[in-house]
Every structure is written in structure tokens, then in C-alpha cells.
């Protein structure tokens, strides 16, 4: 394996960690053990006296919102389970955040069922909006979408709307629901009532995680988060009409699933830099009326599955997407603690860019990547959802992994500390502020400092 900054750091602690980088994330730092390592991120994380968020020197955070606090709109309380998120330019230096709430039927703090914004009054998930003034202070907070279920991640569109993803396949009549679930919903942050609560049914009914839109061709890429066999699929949606703004995805289109010939399970790929041609196979029944999509018959060539497909983000002329982990004990073909893939739509290939091997130390950054976004330096910023310590970590264009933030709020029991996952990492339009959620207890942070 090529020498990387991560393996050099591991060597100093006696921990064996298999990780490597290649491709769009830049040249490998490769050489002998005497080679001078590159600068690592922004430096070590400093303990937070408030025990909320550990950051490097020079960075500071502001708590924007916490679950259970009153919504400024008076519509109820801030919902629980803060997840995927995006930041939009609201003009005159203002920022508008759209934030998912991954609420199941057991959620203690539902998204209030506001008239005109509610799909299924018996579903507790949805989205909220936060308006920030030029100083970064919250001036408004209100419901943008309600009556949806398990709103996990999503993705922004080139026309500045948010696609919110339901990570469930529950049908009407299940768990008290009165509507089918497992859809993508479009939220217009400029006017949520204009987008309403309309499922984009042609984009498929499955356990959606995230989406990314090709701004040049209009193709929408989608990940499916399934941790039980058969695992999830990576999809593309070809809109029936050119995408011209909010609501245009309602015109329908064609859904395909990724096939990598000869690779039925992406976990078997353990060599960063490995590249494969891909095929796109029409999904027999996108509505999953009788059979979930991942169980459907894709013909003699089959289809390619991956355990826990998570974050998905457009950048570098293609789509970065994540497999959070793979476990042979759960049916995967091989073990890993995270993969980051890159799909090049022009060359019609996928390439493994980052691999966190099965020996990854759960107390170090790089265990079970989840939500991702592009960082100001052109690399990736990644949320963890693993065991042990929970980090937001960066992957630089030069291939370094570095800790950017660590969750310092202990939500465990006495003698059994536990830290909640991070979710929804995104940056302000000017790249000067990072926004991120601590999923539990449900805190939204704004992080400022010497970004580069």
C-alpha cells in the first residue's frame, strides 16, 4: 500500500489502519518512511470547555438551534434528529439553511404538521428552515416540509432548491401512515408553499439517502441506504424534460440502476485507484408496487449492490458517493469501514478513491463515512456515523485525512460514554462558514475560522 499521511500517523500509535487515496482527490503522498509528510489539515483539536464541539485553534462555533427549543415561527418546537442540510444565498449577505429531520414514528419531537406543507399527517419527519443575518444570527426558523418519514439526507439542485430523501419503504397502512413513503420531495427555500409536499414518484420508491444533480446534463444520481441483504443500489434518473427550475422534476423520467459487469458487490474492491466501466440498467418497477427495487430482476447480468450507500455530492465533473461500511457477517462480500467512489459520467466509469480498511481505529477520524460535501480547499468534508468518537473529517485534494471537529457532548450513561453522529455538513455560499448537525441531541452548529 502506498504511504499516506493517515498510515504515517497510525504507525506512530502502533495502530494498523488500511487507507489510501487516489484519483480526483489528488496525487498520493507516496514514498519512504523518511519522506516529510504534508501539513495535516488545521492542526489538533482542542477540548471545548463547554463540552459540545472540539475544534482546531482559531476556529469557533455558534449554536444556531437545538431540538426542543421553540420555533421562532410559533409553529411548535424544533424537531429532533437533525440530519441532511444545505445552505442557500438569501441575498444581502444572508444565508438560508434547509435542514432535514429523520423522524420515525417513535420520534419525541415531530415536525409540526403545517397546513399546505404536510404530505401525511401521521408521519413525523420533514424539513425546517433557518434564516441567518450577515452576522450569522438566526432571525427566523420555521417548517418547510412536514408529514414525511425518515428524512435522511438529500441534495441541492442547480436552481437552488433542496431535494429531501425519505429513507424508508413503508406503505400506507404501516405504522399508522395514510400515504406510501420512500420518495424524494423538493423544497423551495425561497417559498416552501410553492413546492408544497409533492412526492417525486418517478425517481423511485426505496430507502433514499442522498442525491446529486449533474448541472450540465440534468441527470440526478441517487443512493440507497440498505444494510440488510440484498444491499442498496446506485441510481441515475433521466428527467423526461429539461430541468428549468422548481417543480420541473415532477414531469417524470426514467430510473436506472448501476451495473458494474463482473462486480455484484462493491465491497470486493479493496484497491484504491481501481476503475471499472459501468452500465445503466432500467429499473423494472420504480414504484416498487410489488417488490422492492433491490430485489427486482435485472436480467442475466444482474445488478451491483453495496452495503450502506450514503452521501452523494457533485464535484470535479462527476459524483462522489459513499459506502459507509461493509461487513461479511451481515452478508457483504468483503469487510471495510468506508469507501468513497467517484463516477465519471463522460467516461462512464466508477473509481474507488478512498478506502478505510477493516482495521480502522474507531477513535480516529475515518470510521463509517456518511454525509459529504465539497470543502473550500477543493477536497471533501465528511461526517462520521460510526462507533467510538465521532468526527467531521476532511480529505484534502492532496489525499490527507484530518480531523475538523469532534463531538464532545456525551449522550451516554455514567461509565458508558457515547457521542452522537454528525450529519448535514455544508458550507455557506462564500465558503467562510461550515454548518453541521449533531444528530443527537439535535444541535445545529455554525463553525467559522481560517478556512482555506
Question: Which residue stretches match the model-derived regions?
Answer:
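N-terminal secretory signal peptides and thylakoid transit peptides that target proteins
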Residues: 1-19
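C-terminal segment of N-terminal export signals and the immediately downstream linker at the start
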Residues: 23-57, 61
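Residue-level detector of Asp-centered blade-edge/turn motifs that repeat once per structural unit
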Residues: 89-92, 157-158, 215-216, 314-316, ...
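Beta-propeller blade signature
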Residues: 124-132, 179-190, 235-239, 338-344, ...
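Beta-propeller domains
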Residues: 266-350
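Loop/turn-rich, solvent-exposed surfaces of beta-rich toroidal or solenoidal domains
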Residues: 323-325, 362-400
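Conserved blade-ending motifs and adjacent loop-strand segments that build the rim/top face
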Residues: 356-370, 400-427
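Blade-level signature of beta-propeller repeat domains, shared across WD40, Kelch, NHL, RCC1
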Residues: 426-452
Amino acid at each position: 500500500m502506498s504511504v499516506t499521511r493517515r498510515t504515517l500517523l497510525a504507525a506512530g500509535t502502533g495502530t494498523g489502519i488500511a487507507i489510501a487515496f487516489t484519483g480526483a482527490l489528488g496525487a498520493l503522498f507516496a514514498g519512504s518512511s523518511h519522506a516529510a509528510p504534508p501539513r495535516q489539515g488545521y492542526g489538533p483539536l482542542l477540548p471545548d470547555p463547554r463540552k459540545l464541539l472540539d475544534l482546531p485553534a482559531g476556529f469557533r462555533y455558534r449554536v444556531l438551534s437545538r431540538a426542543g427549543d421553540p420555533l421562532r415561527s410559533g409553529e411548535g418546537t424544533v424537531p429532533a434528529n437533525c440530519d441532511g442540510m444545505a445552505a442557500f444565498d438569501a441575498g444581502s449577505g444572508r444565508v438560508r439553511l434547509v435542514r432535514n429531520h429523520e423522524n420515525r414514528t417513535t420520534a419525541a419531537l415531530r415536525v409540526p404538521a403545517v397546513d399546505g406543507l404536510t404530505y401525511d399527517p401521521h408521519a413525523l419527519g420533514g424539513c425546517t428552515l433557518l434564516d441567518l443575518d450577515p452576522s450569522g444570527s438566526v432571525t427566523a426558523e420555521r417548517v418547510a416540509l412536514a408529514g414525511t418519514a425518515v428524512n435522511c439526507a438529500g441534495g441541492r439542485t442547480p436552481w437552488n432548491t433542496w431535494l429531501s430523501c425519505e429513507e424508508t419503504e413503508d406503505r400506507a397502512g404501516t405504522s399508522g401512515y395514510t400515504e406510501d413513503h420512500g420518495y424524494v420531495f423538493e423544497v423551495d427555500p425561497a417559498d416552501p408553499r410553492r413546492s408544497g409536499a409533492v412526492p417525486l414518484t418517478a425517481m423511485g420508491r426505496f430507502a433514499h439517502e442522498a442525491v446529486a444533480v449533474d448541472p450540465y446534463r440534468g441527470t440526478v444520481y441517487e443512493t440507497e441506504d440498505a444494510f440488510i441483504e440484498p444491499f442498496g443500489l446506485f441510481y441515475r434518473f433521466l428527467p423526461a424534460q429539461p430541468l428549468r427550475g422548481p417543480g420541473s422534476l415532477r414531469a417524470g423520467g426514467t430510473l436506472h440502476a448501476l451495473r458494474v459487469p463482473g462486480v455484484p458487490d462493491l465491497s470486493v474492491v479493496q484497491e484504491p485507484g481501481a476503475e471499472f466501466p459501468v452500465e445503466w440498467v432500467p429499473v423494472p418497477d420504480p414504484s416498487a408496487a410489488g417488490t422492492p427495487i433491490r430485489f427486482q430482476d435485472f436480467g442475466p447480468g444482474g445488478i451491483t449492490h453495496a452495503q450502506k450507500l450514503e452521501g452523494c455530492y457533485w464535484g470535479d465533473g462527476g459524483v462522489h458517493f459513499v459506502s459507509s461500511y461493509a461487513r461479511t457477517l451481515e452478508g457483504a462480500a468483503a469487510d471495510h469501514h468506508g469507501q468513497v467512489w467517484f463516477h465519471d459520467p463522460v467516461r462512464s466509469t466508477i473509481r474507488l478513491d478512498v478506502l478505510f480498511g477493516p482495521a480502522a481505529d474507531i477513535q480516529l477520524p475515518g470510521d463509517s463515512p456518511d454525509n459529504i460535501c465539497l470543502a473550500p480547499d477543493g477536497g471533501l468534508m465528511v461526517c462520521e456515523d460510526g462507533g467510538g468518537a465521532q468526527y467531521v473529517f476532511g480529505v484534502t485534494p492532496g489525499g490527507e485525512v484530518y480531523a475538523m471537529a469532534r463531538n464532545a457532548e456525551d449522550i451516554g450513561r455514567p461509565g458508558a460514554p457515547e457521542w452522537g453522529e454528525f450529519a448535514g455538513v455544508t458550507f455557506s455560499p462564500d465558503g467562510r462558514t461550515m454548518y453541521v448537525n449533531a444528530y443527537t441531541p439535535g444541535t445545529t452548529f455554525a463553525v467559522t475560522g481560517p478556512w482555506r
